């Protein structure tokens, strides 16, 4: 919900799983949030930006988290397409 100034005033904004688009519940203690740094291609140094991926506990329980993170990183251009 937003107020008249356009600021978010909700007390709780749920996260969503980046792989399955499910809402990550507050009691899902198996879920993770991972920041992957963006690196300058010429110097190999961190440029101050990162991509955030959230993986829910159900994906981790099935053992699909590594494949999901790799698929998301390929789609964002962090990992090369032929990796």
Swiss-Prot record:
The keyword Ribosomal protein applies. Keywords: Acetylation, Cytoplasm, Endoplasmic reticulum, Ribonucleoprotein, Ribosomal protein. GO terms for biological process: cytoplasmic translation. The modification N6-acetyllysine is found at residue 81. Pfam families: Ribosomal_S21e (PF01249). One of its GO terms (cellular component) is ribosome. It comes from the Eukaryota. The keyword Cytoplasm applies. The modification N-acetylmethionine is found at residue 1. Signal peptide: none annotated. It is found in: Cytoplasm, Cytosol; Cytoplasm; Rough endoplasmic reticulum. GO terms for molecular function: ribosome binding; structural constituent of ribosome. PANTHER family: 40S RIBOSOMAL PROTEIN S21 (PTHR10442). Belongs to the eukaryotic ribosomal protein eS21 family. Component of the 40S small ribosomal subunit. Component of the small ribosomal subunit. The ribosome is a large ribonucleoprotein complex responsible for the synthesis of proteins in the cell. This is Small ribosomal subunit protein eS21. The lineage of its organism: Eukaryota, Metazoa, Chordata, Craniata, Vertebrata.
């Amino acid at each position: 919900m937003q107020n008249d100034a356009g600021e978010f005033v909700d007390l709780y904004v749920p996260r969503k799983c980046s792989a399955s688009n499910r809402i990550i519940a507050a009691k899902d203690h198996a879920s993770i949030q991972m920041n992957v740094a963006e690196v300058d291609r010429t110097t190999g140094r961190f440029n101050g930006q990162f991509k955030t991926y959230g993986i829910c506990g159900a994906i981790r329980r099935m053992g699909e988290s590594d494949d999901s993170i790799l698929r998301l990183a390929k789609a964002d251009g962090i990992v090369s397409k032929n990796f």
